[in-house]
Amino acid sequence: MLAYLRKGETYADLAGGFGIGLATVFRYVREALDVLAAMASSLTTAVGIARRKAFVIVDGTLLRTDRVGMTGGRDRPFYSGKHKRHGVNVQVLADPAGRLIWTSPALPGARHDMGAAREHGLLDALEKAGVRVIADSAYRSASANVEVPHRRPPRDPDTGERRRRLSANEKAVNSAHARLRGPGERANAQLKS
């Protein structure tokens, strides 16, 4: 099981390496994944844990997958145009130290982070619980409890010129925001390593 999870070995490689049948490998992997899934905390439990923290970090990550050979473009939902890879979108909830609190069920990789968080009810549950959320700019306009970095205003539609640069104060706020959000990337790294 560890060889499957850690190295991504195929069932055929596992069967050959351990000298067991392919059906046995399939059964062992399914049983182990079912046990791990049963041990995972629910969103309700995760929000209860988050309520006891000063803030939580929400971030989405793309877990790469092999391209599935589907005809007729049925694999398109799994292709992330942002990352130029096939994968699944997983929402991650982490504490201020970067420890994993909760991960969402996987959605197709083409799904935007905020759309995925809304589909799982993550943002609504955190807002209802009054939890302060630190997130990246993908979660802009999510809700009042979600803090995102300032962004430079868009171009003026009439002249095409940038309206203004970020002020020194806005840059300082963005820098502090990035320091708070940084440990959340560690939680994402735990999923990928």
Q: Residue ranges of each PLM-predicted region?
A:
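Short, well-ordered secondary-structure "scaffold" segments embedded in the functional core
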Residues: D13, G17-R27, D34-A37, S41-S193
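Short, amphipathic alpha-helical "recognition" segments used to contact nucleic acids or chromatin
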Residues: M1-K7
